[in-house]
UniProtKB/Swiss-Prot annotation:
GO terms for cellular component: chromosome; mitochondrion; nucleolus; nucleus; RNA polymerase I complex. Keywords: Chromosome, DNA-directed RNA polymerase, Magnesium, Metal-binding, Nucleotidyltransferase, Nucleus, Phosphoprotein, Transcription, Transferase, Zinc, Zinc-finger. InterPro entries: DNA-dir_RNA_pol_su2 (IPR015712), DNA-dir_RNAP_su2_dom (IPR007120), DNA-dir_RNAP_su2_hyb_sf (IPR037033), RNA_pol_bsu_CS (IPR007121), RNA_pol_bsu_protrusion (IPR007644), RNA_pol_Rpb2_2 (IPR007642), RNA_pol_Rpb2_2_sf (IPR037034), RNA_pol_Rpb2_3 (IPR007645). Residues 236-247 are annotated as: Loop A. Zn(2+) binds at residues 1070, 1073, 1098, 1101. Residues 474-489 are annotated as: Fork loop 2. This is DNA-directed RNA polymerase I subunit RPA2. DNA template strand binds at residue 1036. GO terms for biological process: embryo implantation; neural crest formation; nucleologenesis; rRNA transcription. The lineage of its organism: Eukaryota, Metazoa, Chordata, Craniata, Vertebrata. Mg(2+) binds at residue 755.
Amino acid sequence: MDVDSRWRNLPSGPSLKHLTDPSYAVPPEQQKAALQDLTRAHVDSFNYAVLEGLSHAVQAIPPFEFAFKDERISLTIVDAAISPPAVPKGTICKELNIYPAECRGRRSTYRGKLTADISWAVNGVPKGIIKQFLGXVPIMVKSKLCNLYNLPPQVLIEHHEEAEEMGGYFIINGIEKVIRMLIMPRRNFPIAMIRPKWKSRGLGYTQFGVSIHCVREEHSAVNMNLHYVENGTVMLNFIYRKELFFLPLGFALKALVSFSDYQIFQELIKGKEEDSFFKNSVSQMLRIVMEEGCHTQKQVLDYLGERFRVKLSLPDWYPNAEAAEFLFNQCICIHLKSNTDKFYLLCLMTRKLFALARGECMEDNPDSLVNQEVLTPGQLFLMFLKEKMENWLLSIKIALDKRAQKTNVSINNENLMKIFSMGTELTRPFEYLLATGNLRSKTGLGFMQDSGLCVVADKLNFIRYLSHFRCVHRGADFAKMRTTTVRKLLPESWGFLCPVHTPDGAPCGLLNHLTAVCEVVTKFVYTASIPALLCGLGVTPVDAAPCRPYSDCYPVLLDGVMVGWVDKELAPEVADTLRRFKVLRERRCSSLDGGGPDSHDRKAKPVPRAVPLHHSLQAGEACAEPGAGQRRARWNYGAALHEHCHLRGRGFWWSFHTPGALPSQPAEVIANFIPFSDHNQSPRNMYQCQMGKQTMGFPLLTYQDRSDNKLYRLQTPQSPLVRPCMYDHYDMDNYPIGTNAIVAVISYTGYDMEDAMIVNKASWERGFAHGSVYKSEFIDLSEKFKQGDDSLVFGVKPGDPRVMQKLDNDGLPFIGAKLEFGDPYYGYLNLNTGEGFVVYYKSKENCVVDNIKVCSNDTGSGKFKCVCVTVRVPRNPTIGDKFASRHGQKGILSRLWPAEDMPFTESGMMPDILFNPHGFPSRMTIGMLIESMAGKSAALHGLCHDATPFIFSEENSALEYFGEMLKAAGYNFYGTERLYSGISGMELEADIFIGVVYYQRLRHMVSDKFQVRTTGARDKVTNQPIGGRNVQGGIRFGEMERDALLAHGTSFLLHDRLFNCSDRSVAHVCVKCGSLLSPLLEKPPPSWSAMRNRKYNCTVCGRSDSIDTVSVPYVFRYFVAELAAMNIKVKLDVI
């Protein structure tokens, strides 16, 4: 669907009519497009990776060659394919296809088989192709390899999925995991940077450098830097298998092309013919190469190959020159296939580096979206897959060598098939990556981090679930930096990154979210025809000489390839022509359109848009119709080296719609759910984005099919009477997160200070904000018996008195049964011995058995050994539970006030919540006041008000609009009413502001956090009480508690809390030498009786009359022993 059409068909305003629609319970014919778009970047990138990208990756894997018994063996992966998830043949089942719900229920991984065609050759002679299973790799839900792909809602429901299932995640051991989108440096573009830490890389190194993030067609990435040295030379820095290497630039230039030194000199000084310092520096760099005796390209290659081949692990028969070429293919400008193109790019980077070092240009800002791109899940998946396939080839050599040590192995098809089956499968590395988020890689894949790549897509509520697919993270390494530069919100982020939705605290500014109208387009586009088009517009090819001097021309780049030069005076005209071609879709520029066969036939209006290429934003760009896969040419004026033009034609881009089309355009999806957010203080909107994700809501409709560790459910959710139009655009009424409450702003009691709130007890008894927690536990009897023993099954012995009629004959509790602490939970039998076992319910919290699922093994032949028990824990709001409005106004429930004592209006209505008016002045959440008036008028007139930001202004005031509606209903214009005291019955003198506000109950509940302990377990080392609620630990008595006792004048209580009740112990000490370690109990001779008293003797003094006992903390004794191990003596003065 076109970008424009998706945002033209927005709801004109919110409505409640679909809540009373007779066909409300009937699944629609198609899924909601708006919800599917939220995960499109994840799904499309994975589709590209496993289809087109996989073939590119296979072609990029070089043949693996090694010597075996004086023969040269070559293994090449010629093709690979991933199949949809299915059970093996011969499995006991009704259907071979595996669906995600089955993997969630069984806590297994949703994966498909990866098979490859391996070509093998001996001494260069091809011998055949073997099809080999390499392992099972995870499959993204709703991708083209998923069995749910393109299924309508009705069929999705039949397969136990949500009708609006969006996909975009993996299922690993039954847990939904999302690969984070990461912000990476802009690909294939030289970025000038100043880094003071670069001075520590070697003698003479400076802080000036030019960095480039080189990315191949299959997304393999390598970071490369040019460093400016104090003597005027340049060092080339690259990474190979996580090891840093430095190479003088002259060697790299000389090895890439067979140019003479004079030709290299002339290419480097283009545009700087009058700069004597630069010319001398170039001469010196070339002179360094000559001093090593390298005069030709062949000599340079031999020189580099001889020194680097020890790190490359190449066969012995590779000559040094080929080893050097292998190094350049893997590490130097890997996005370019031609060595000549690499040469021209290095020359351009060198000129840019000298311009930066001499102050002729500014450094590029790596924190700007201009110089950034997004790493999508499919890219990470493909990069990791390619590396593991290369590792598999290496494991075959290792397996072959091990086999040859034991037996005589000949190389033939049959033996190779056996050896291939001994290779390292890809199953466990992929599951480890997605389960932990930690990257185990020999090369590092060009990342700056190796952890935090994946997160759990927890369904605490629906908007929290959505946020996982819209977030982009800057990187874990940036969180450790002390500077705040990386966290700043720059102006060019407008329309791409949400200025509201970012966490407060450590990840602030690093974990951002895409705006609602921002898209990550993942289609790959080819650019082969663009250079010819540029030449027709007046661009001089790179190997030709322009009519004007090079200093009067701009270099032109296309995907990191220097394609030529353009006259400065002609450049604006060329740029305007390219933009016109893209806007009008003229036939001569049809190659710029990659949208499809009919893309050039569609009509498009010339609408300005910012369209960054490769996920990066370029200031001042204009483009029309940024559909999927379109080509775009970029002109970057005022850039570092020469104000050069930069054309980007392929890759991954962000696009957003016309500025001004939507009032909520710059905001993220969740930020768009905040009513009247333009009337609130900005930090309150940030808080609501976080608290909205902590709300106990209605995250899904298939509770009976889920086996999550913990799920929350709001029992009585409601549709808000006041909401933005985006709420209806995403059909959030299917997944509500709160309740409409009558809120009176009044200081009625003393229990509502510091944001606390009073709740009407009658409302509480009628189910206000009542919720439940669903907890699932897997019970696998195979973990309880020894290996080889298969005799345990669920069941109970007839007449077992321990069961107390609370377990069924199958040993499991009854559905709907109430469980209390100590009740029988489940039972199982040993079929060999006939012995019965009963396990009791250990939680202190009462619950109800909601459902029980019986699970089998992968082949369907498992016995009755594994079940999943889901219990429901009712959670009525209790004192201390946390609530919040949609405006960042959070507070705890401080008191359930009797309805008889609540204030009431003249119509007899009592509020559900009493809110302290002191919460408004400092927070400045005017949006909540407006919502109260709007909710009140909506309830009176039977309407649903639009709370989209910026629909009201000073000329069109929200107060007047809603005030007039209240006045028309017979109420006060300002939303106030006269209330009567519930205690005295007398009318209150002040007018009380009362209305309807949508309130959220947060997951932070006292029932999950309270701790009570008198005595209990202690730490084995320090002998202090252990901490932690799950292990019945104590509550930490910290510095603030200590200060509170001191302030109350009860300082001696500290002796009891911190000593007597902590780790008090009695120790023996030598008064004379002051040692705690030297007193030892004397060893009795065999003639002594067991009843005879023994004395403590000091091993240093040799006396027993100087031993005394003292009370000291046990941790002090441990500390003294640790110091003694470090040869440090502690001497005590005993008084």
